[in-house]
Amino acid sequence: MKKNKDVLLKNKILKKLNIINIKNLDNIKEKLKKPDWIKIKIPVNTSRIYQIKNALRKNNLYSVCEEAHCPNLSECFNNGTATFMILGSICTRNCPFCAVFHGRPNPVNVEEPQKLSDTIFDMGINYVVITSVVRDDLYDGGAEHFVNCIKAIKNKNQVKIEILVPDFRGRIELILNIFNKALPDIFNHNIENVPRLFKKIRPGANYQRSLLLLESFKKKYCSVLTKSGLMLGLGEKDVEIIQVMKDLYSSGVTLLTVGQYLQPSIHHLPVKRYIPLSEFENIKKEALSIGFTNAFCGPFIRSSYHASFQSHLPIKNNDINNI
């Protein structure tokens, strides 16, 4: 039975990656051994996890938790929280670190905003994170659909809404005007890593374009908190990390997340290095000294992990294990 499951999982991963070209992975003979601190705690009672999954399936919705193989899925689902992924489950880009399906996406589901709102109401949650696949096939990159989702959710629910958006191909003026119709409480766009590695890690993205999106949104909608995140372990240097944090802060970002990159499968980019806990603590100290209100740094930290906690509670200590 286990062998059959392994085969099915392998086939699913290969199907996701059949268009992605990742160089030199076949030449990697040894995989880095995971250190002791890279351990995922599985809850004993999984009934809540299946309840969330069934609610998503029932309404034909997606969670980035599942699609991106997030290590925190069990904990978050067990606590009744999920990060919803709109605009389908197929991404138009082929970032080799990401487990989300890549290819030609389906047409936008105009019923999704209302289904999303109804599901959030049924789940009874008070903080919502919405993200999406990259939709370079759409003129506005999906911005109008984000707005429609925000409207639908707020019409039925008294919740705070955080959106984690793509770069919209740099159509910043268009995007800013569209979001004037409905604003989130937090605007998040992940920078992911250092500019030197962008071509390898984020083909199709541009470091300065991402910074400009964050800066422009903050200038136009100053009441909305702006947020960004990095994943480490792909070959970046300490001095580069510090410079990225300074660039983000200069662009108006006040909330920061920094986590460890974990290879979704053998077909994705390999981990170059596992960051020790002490280094995450140092990164957090540096971020707070730069001026960030909140800096959440640790191996399992993700942009939407404990997002409601991140959004309103300034953290001025270095205990990453309290998160």
From Swiss-Prot:
GO function terms (MF aspect): 4 iron, 4 sulfur cluster binding; lipoate synthase activity; metal ion binding
GO cellular component terms given for this protein: cytoplasm
InterPro entries (alphabetical): Aldolase_TIM, Elp3/MiaA/NifB-like_rSAM, LIAS_N, Lipoyl_synth, rSAM
Cofactor: [4Fe-4S] cluster
EC number: 2.8.1.8
Keyword terms of this UniProt record: 4Fe-4S, Cytoplasm, Iron, Iron-sulfur, Metal-binding, S-adenosyl-L-methionine, Transferase
Binding site for [4Fe-4S] cluster 2: C91, C95, C98
Primary subcellular site in the record, as a coarse category: cytoplasm
One Pfam family from the record: Radical_SAM
Subcellular location: Cytoplasm
Reactions that this protein is recorded to catalyse: [[Fe-S] cluster scaffold protein carrying a second [4Fe-4S](2+) cluster] + N(6)-octanoyl-L-lysyl-[protein] + 2 oxidized [2Fe-2S]-[ferredoxin] + 2 S-adenosyl-L-methionine + 4 H(+) = [[Fe-S] cluster scaffold protein] + N(6)-[(R)-dihydrolipoyl]-L-lysyl-[protein] + 4 Fe(3+) + 2 hydrogen sulfide + 2 5'-deoxyadenosine + 2 L-methionine + 2 reduced [2Fe-2S]-[ferredoxin]
Cofactor annotation remark: Binds 2 [4Fe-4S] clusters per subunit. One cluster is coordinated with 3 cysteines and an exchangeable S-adenosyl-L-methionine.
SMART domains: Elp3
Stretches assigned to the Radical SAM core domain: 77-293
Pathway in which this enzyme or protein is active: Protein modification; protein lipoylation via endogenous pathway; protein N(6)-(lipoyl)lysine from octanoyl-[acyl-carrier-protein]: step 2/2
Lineage top rank: taxon: Bacteria
Enzyme kind, highest EC tier: transferase
Residues annotated to bind [4Fe-4S] cluster 1: C65, C70, C76, S304
Entry keyword annotation includes S-adenosyl-L-methionine: yes
Family label: Belongs to the radical SAM superfamily. Lipoyl synthase family.
The protein's name: Lipoyl synthase
